[in-house]
Amino acid sequence: MKIFAILGASASGKSALGLRLAKELECFILSLDSLSIYQEINIASAKPSKEELLSIRHFGIDLLTPNEPSNAALFAHLFEEALEASNQAGKKALLLVGGTGFFLKRIIEGLSPAPTLDPSAKEWLKEVLENRREAFKELEKIDPLYTSRITPSDLHRLRRGWEIYLGSGLSPSLFFETHPPKPLGHDLKIYELTLERELLRQRITERTEQMLESGLIDEVCQLESRYTREPQAMKSIGIAETLAYLDGEISKEELTPLISTHTAQLAKRQTTFNKTQFTSIRHLEAPRLFEEICHTITKS
């Protein structure tokens, strides 16, 4: 089975291209998006529509509530799940589509397997993490090297450190040393969907306007009411600026250009990351990218 990763900046059209390819190749899609994995964050994430999700099986969408943590390990697990489902269904290809190249990098490099916790340990840890500063101090006594690389507010890594210690009896640093990551054992072709800069900026602005017309402000109000502003997802582009508007820090007229500017800055960082991290990546416009992937499947 062939595995293709299609990366691209926000608003580049990668999701639409991925859907078109998935329909053509009759394959599944693993979404590599840090927001689409959350339920209820529909407008801010610009996730595929309900109809599109029904037409093509997706992995990595609507799995978590906004107050649950997401991390690279979860996407590595989702990749294995999508790969197994594709093999069982006799698919010829699997598409990985999204803007978060960091998740793809972790899938390729592999992750150290995290030990499992029994229910009582999970409950104990949940209570401990209610006071992150104290949880950090206690973990610091166990592994000062590990905690020197994180902060008390880094809930994802703080939780992972405790899970490793409780599940294995080893300090996180020693666990990582004795349980090295297992690299991806599958052939993977990586593409980046390219667009002329001014066209991308125009699309970003248009998408931002569409998000606001579709009810972004109401969505953010509901999310804040249910989950507060504490979860990491609530600090994402689109949500953070809307909260600033609700606080009276910016006007409604300033909201669209501010979200657009931050999205464009993110797009630039995404492109830079992809160029530096994936040496074999191919940069193609949509028609050529579509044609090349289809040709690869046809000749196999």
Curated annotation (Swiss-Prot):
Keywords annotated in UniProt: ATP-binding, Magnesium, Nucleotide-binding, Transferase, tRNA processing
Top EC category: transferase
Binding sites annotated in the UniProt record for substrate: S10, A11, S12, G13, K14, S15
Site residues, Interaction with substrate tRNA: T100
Reactions accelerated catalytically: adenosine(37) in tRNA + dimethylallyl diphosphate = N(6)-dimethylallyladenosine(37) in tRNA + diphosphate
Binding locations of ATP: G8, A9, S10, A11, S12, G13, K14, S15
Protein name: tRNA dimethylallyltransferase
Organism: Wolinella succinogenes (strain ATCC 29543 / DSM 1740 / CCUG 13145 / JCM 31913 / LMG 7466 / NCTC 11488 / FDC 602W) (Vibrio succinogenes)
